[in-house]
């Protein structure tokens, strides 16, 4: 499965020798080894530079296409969410505040959703 995530040549490396992006991809390889129907990603681009973030987003989309899996991505990175999602849900105060297609989020008139997207939401 390392080949599916672009790491065919790292099987002999120790974890300390891997970059942050490589470690994320090794995690994906481990997740797909059991051939799941659903993959849950928890903040897959957190801590990565823009290049590796794009690489991980592309990999998520590629795994969806090749393995025909459903992906559930938990992220605060709205650009990443737009890139990998067909549908988005915003959870606010423990409840789903809004769920729908990406285009619906970009053009929302919901104040809480708009504040989140604009980075102007006040912390509780």
Residue ranges, per PLM feature:
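Conserved ABC ATPase signature
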Residues: 14-18, 22
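Conserved ABC ATPase "signature" region
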Residues: 2-9
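A short, surface-exposed alpha-helical micro-motif characterized by mixed small hydrophobic
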Residues: 81-83
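A short, proline-enriched helix->beta-strand linker immediately N-terminal to the Walker B motif
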Residues: 33-37
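Helical segment within the ABC ATPase nucleotide-binding domain
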Residues: 54-66
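Catalytic Walker B motif of ABC-type/P-loop ATPase nucleotide-binding domains
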Residues: 39-42
């Amino acid at each position: 499965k390392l080949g599916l995530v672009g790491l065919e040549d790292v099987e002999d490396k120790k974890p300390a020798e891997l970059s942050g992006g490589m470690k994320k991809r090794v995690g994906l390889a481990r997740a797909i080894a059991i051939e799941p129907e659903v993959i849950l990603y928890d903040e897959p681009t957190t801590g990565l530079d823009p290049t590796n973030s794009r690489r991980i987003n592309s990999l998520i989309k590629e795994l969806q296409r090749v393995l025909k899996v459903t992906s559930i991505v938990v992220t605060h990175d709205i650009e990443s969410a737009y890139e990998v999602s067909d549908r988005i849900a915003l959870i606010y105060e423990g409840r789903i505040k809004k769920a729908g297609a990406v285009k619906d989020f970009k053009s929302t008139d919901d104040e809480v959703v708009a504040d989140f997207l604009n980075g102007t939401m006040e912390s509780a």
